[in-house]
From Swiss-Prot:
Belongs to the universal ribosomal protein uL10 family. Signal peptide: none annotated. Keywords: Ribonucleoprotein, Ribosomal protein, RNA-binding, rRNA-binding. One of its GO terms (molecular function) is large ribosomal subunit rRNA binding. It holds the Pfam family Ribosomal_L10. Part of the ribosomal stalk of the 50S ribosomal subunit. The N-terminus interacts with L11 and the large rRNA to form the base of the stalk. The C-terminus forms an elongated spine to which L12 dimers bind in a sequential fashion forming a multimeric L10(L12)X complex. One of its GO terms (cellular component) is large ribosomal subunit. GO terms for biological process: translation. It comes from Legionella pneumophila (strain Corby). PROSITE patterns: RIBOSOMAL_L10. This is Large ribosomal subunit protein uL10. Forms part of the ribosomal stalk, playing a central role in the interaction of the ribosome with GTP-bound translation factors.
């Protein structure tokens, strides 16, 4: 389907706007995927907060110009789509890694975070990063542990005294423990 000049400019503006807000980007080859598989992938991407778009490579290059994902331009060859993570750096990587296991024809080419390109072999490291909520909960657990230990240490002498008094009371009552 050919696009007129106004439609092409609109696509470039849309992708540029999303790319300027994105945290990471993944480029993948979708050759061999069926329409149903692509529809399922797009649906999951929407749920995950990932912007997934199939755009002509020349338009994608123009859209990524002057963004931190300009480094992906050399990889925009053949039928590829771009997935942009808007909430967490690992969202798009995790989504496409899971789908690459299910649909073997999906080939992840590269990932870009912070202006650096990582190849498909390194995507596992980014995909395994915790989400923001998971990271906050782990941090809170680590911060809470020393305080809990301190509170237990402060409470132990009182608890020991209470147990000793209970044992003395039971012994005087004739019920040896």
């Amino acid at each position: 389907m050919t696009l007129n000049l106004a439609a092409k400019k609109a696509v470039v503006e849309e992708v540029t706007a999303v790319a300027s807000k994105a945290i990471s980007a993944v480029v993948a080859d979708y050759r061999g995927l069926t329409v149903n598989q692509m529809t399922q992938l797009r649906s999951e991407a929407r749920k995950s907060g990932v912007y997934l778009r199939v755009v002509r490579n020349t338009l994608t290059r123009r859209a990524l110009k002057n963004t931190e994902f300009e480094c992906l331009n050399d990889l925009l060859v053949g039928p590829v789509f771009i997935a942009l993570s808007l909430e967490a750096p690992s969202d798009a990587a995790r989504l496409l890694k899971d789908y690459a296991k299910t649909f073997e024809k999906l080939e992840i080419r590269a990932l870009s975070v912070g202006g650096k390109v990582y190849n498909a072999n390194q995507i596992d490291a980014v995909a395994s990063l915790p989400t923001r909520d998971e990271a906050i909960s782990k941090l809170m657990y680590v911060m809470k542990a020393p305080i809990e230990k301190f509170v237990r240490t402060l409470a132990e002498p009182h608890a020991k005294l209470a147990r000793t008094l209970a044992a003395v009371k039971d012994k005087k009552a004739g019920n040896p423990a």
